[in-house]
């Protein structure tokens, strides 16, 4: 079985044990990337699946039903962005509880899914509808990709870059948990995240060597890139682009940002950054560098603040005790 290119954590330790039991059913390509890739004629398809569960990924007192559908679809489609893929379609398994006075909930949720799909030129291809003890969506996304970018391609000397601004989703979540309604723009960062599919395609065609979407938090997802590519990653916290009112360490820990963390060759220039911004309307910031890997002293991820190492903030882990 191919190696599982993931960083540390209880969730990923469990995945390693699960994949070790797959035997001949395991794929030959490395497991643990954002999408599975396979050829269909002359087309390379990118496929991924993502779950959103009430009480874990969303709460009904924070989001309306359309937002629940939109956010769930965005989380799934973001995996396609991380591979540089175009979105084709979605399959949705929707679980709804028994009558709770919300007779139009399923329609509203699916309207939100459809709106998110339409925004990236994708279709809702079908799915399944079941009774469940709470609201739940499993969304399978299908895309096509010309130049896939995986987590395993970074090399020593590559620059580490990130799209957009970090920390907004975490700040919005903090305010929602405190019972405060965030300002509209900040709330939308959590409720209706912007997708980076166009940015992912641009980066893929302009030489990105490795890429991942930020779902568990910048620091945690950098560990996945480091493990998959067998390089060290050094990130300068002072360089992190972040929302107003968010400190650098909080920005590095904020999950479900759905921005792209990526590596580019050393020759990627300021002129290329300007072209990217002009073509996509998205910010792109260099935040660090890839260092020697292969078991060397500089493997793993190191965060620097004022040139001093700081403790990595933990990313989200479904199975942490």
Model-derived features: positions:
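Extreme N-terminal cap/leader segments of soluble proteins
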Residues: 1-64, 83, 92, 116, ...
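Short, compositionally biased
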Residues: 170-187
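Short hydrophobic/aromatic beta-strand micro-patches
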Residues: 142, 261-265
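Glycine-rich anion-binding loops of enzyme active sites
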Residues: 42-45, 52, 86-175, 289
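Active-site-proximal betaalpha loop/short-helix elements
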Residues: 98-101, 175, 188-257
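Acidic, Ser/Thr/Pro-rich beta/coil linker or hinge segments at domain junctions
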Residues: 190-194, 273-321
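Residue-level signal for inorganic ion chemistry
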Residues: 37, 76, 84, 124, ...
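Small-aliphatic-rich amphipathic alpha-helix that forms the alpha element of a beta-alpha
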Residues: 65-91, 108-119, 220-225
